[in-house]
């Protein structure tokens, strides 16, 4: 259920949620929407594993970020029976605004404090998404998916997967 008590998952068929492979970023770097590549060997390993384990004929959707797109394209090359769809913006990771590409340790303490004190509403990095806006984007994507009857695999990000789980578990209804 969403914050208004509406069921966002009624008649939602099977969805496999896959996090992108390990990325190539410096330790401590703040990134969300930042388009960083996945490590090629990890992308190949993940694609091979998924190709062996996923059922036939799934619809294949992914975030537009290259760390997800690379896996989707490689998986589709190995499994042409998967129905590759254009990237879905709602599957992208949270936009952390002006913090993107900077080291967490170098971010202004006052901004981080303001963010943690109003996590649901404060725009990350001053120009990015609030957690509430991020979850609303995911919820809108889930609502649109209710009309899709095919089983699907979504290649996305850890934050999106957590958000989907929170929404499906109804953990946000009281907040």
Task: Kindly give the residue locations of the regions a language model identified.
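Acidic, low-complexity terminal tails and accessory targeting/binding regions
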Residues: 1-14, 52-55, 81, 85, ...
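Active-site-adjacent alpha-helix immediately C-terminal to a catalytic or transition-state-stabilizing loop
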Residues: 12, 69, 139-175
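Active-site-proximal alpha-helix that buttresses catalytic centers in soluble enzyme cores
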Residues: 13-80
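Short, solvent-exposed loop/turn segments at secondary-structure junctions
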Residues: 22-24, 66-67, 92-93, 158-161
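Amphipathic, non-transmembrane alpha-helical scaffold segments
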Residues: 43, 65, 131, 135-139
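Generic structural signal for well-ordered alpha-helical scaffold segments
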Residues: 47-51, 135, 139-146
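Short beta-strand scaffold positions
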Residues: 62-63, 136, 155-156
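Phosphate-handling substructures
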Residues: 78-137
């Amino acid at each position: 259920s969403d914050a208004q008590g509406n069921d966002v998952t009624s008649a939602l068929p099977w969805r496999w949620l896959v996090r992108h492979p390990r990325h190539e970023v410096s330790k401590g770097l703040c990134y969300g929407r930042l388009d960083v590549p996945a490590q090629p060997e990890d992308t190949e390993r993940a694609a091979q594993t998924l190709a062996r384990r996923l059922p036939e004929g799934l619809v294949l959707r992914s975030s537009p970020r290259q760390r997800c797109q690379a896996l989707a394209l490689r998986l589709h090359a190995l499994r042409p029976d998967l129905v590759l769809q254009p990237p879905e913006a709602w599957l992208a990771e949270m936009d952390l605004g002006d913090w993107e590409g900077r080291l967490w340790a170098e971010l202004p303490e006052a901004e981080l404090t303001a963010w943690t004190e109003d996590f649901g509403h404060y725009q990350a990095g001053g120009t990015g998404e609030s957690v509430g806006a991020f979850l609303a984007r995911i919820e809108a994507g889930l609502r649109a998916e209710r009309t899709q009857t095919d089983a699907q695999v979504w290649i996305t990000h850890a934050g999106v997967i957590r958000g989907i789980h929170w929404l499906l578990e109804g953990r946000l209804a009281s907040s």
